[in-house]
Curated annotation (Swiss-Prot):
Record keywords, A-Z: Acetylation, Actin capping, Actin-binding, Cytoplasm, Cytoskeleton, Phosphoprotein
Broad class of the protein's primary localization: cytoplasm
Gene3D superfamilies: 1.20.58.570, F-actin capping protein, beta subunit
Gene Ontology CC terms: actin cortical patch; actin cytoskeleton; cellular bud neck contractile ring; cellular bud tip; F-actin capping protein complex; incipient cellular bud site; mating projection tip; plasma membrane
Subcellular location per the Swiss-Prot or TrEMBL entry: Cytoplasm, Cytoskeleton, Actin patch; Bud; Bud tip; Cytoplasm, Cytoskeleton
Top-level taxon of the source organism: Eukaryota
GO MF, one annotated term: actin filament binding
Sequence similarity: Belongs to the F-actin-capping protein beta subunit family.
GO biological process, one term: filamentous growth
Name of the molecule in the record: F-actin-capping protein subunit beta
Function: F-actin-capping proteins bind in a Ca(2+)-independent manner to the fast growing ends of actin filaments (barbed end) thereby blocking the exchange of subunits at these ends. Unlike other capping proteins (such as gelsolin and severin), these proteins do not sever actin filaments.
Alphabetical list of SUPFAM superfamilies matching this protein: Subunits of heterodimeric actin filament capping protein Capz
Record has Cytoplasm as a keyword: yes
Gene name in the database record: CAP2
Amino acid sequence: MSDAQFDAALDLLRRLNPTTLQENLNNLIELQPNLAQDLLSSVDVPLSTQKDSADSNREYLCCDYNRDIDSFRSPWSNTYYPELSPKDLQDSPFPSAPLRKLEILANDSFDVYRDLYYEGGISSVYLWDLNEEDFNGHDFAGVVLFKKNQSDHSNWDSIHVFEVTTSPSSPDSFNYRVTTTIILHLDKTKTDQNSHMMLSGNLTRQTEKDIAIDMSRPLDVIFTSHVANLGSLIEDIESQMRNLLETVYFEKTRDIFHQTKNAAIASSAEEANKDAQAEVIRGLQSL
């Protein structure tokens, strides 16, 4: 694969309709199969869901980080669905036993976060080891996923990919690096006004912070500290990005509408633009 082909594929995806991102991505992979692995790991697409039959058909979120072949690992039962053959399972990625305990704690904790902040939706957390040694509370990575749908086909997907590594400056300090992508789709129809408004796109930001943890404490306490630190970071990131979407991007969208409207209907268009912006913000706040 050449860098030029990969860059061209990413540039093309940025210019195409974001509502057909998955279809466009599949078409590019079909045209250039050698780009498949890099595109799948680099392009964030709206999250899909599966049901865990081993845990009362509880829903979980699917992404490239819990995928093996065409199956996705559930964070609830640690099982792949659709089920893999015994031979395939031998090579399938699973977190180590200690890291799996942290994964369970993280899923339970972020499920509470989801209920409080999203008032619905689905959350999933997946972790993986960064080295082959037994996990003892040090270096690991993972992803925290949230999805909230509305009955009007609007949806919010947030993907937080993170790494937790020992800080080079102190053995009791950890470096948390989080890359967050928000995928937003707002679809509003007013039947009384015979109008339809749709807004789609994604926004990515990165943050990094060093936080001290007392490594002399029991492993369960260290796990709780990691989850609390990640929760605090993700809460701050999501709040900042929501505000950024409302106060910057939607304002810019309204300005573009204003600049392109017909001068002959300036007054009515301005009112329509204000209504459209208010409708977009209400749609975002409901997710």
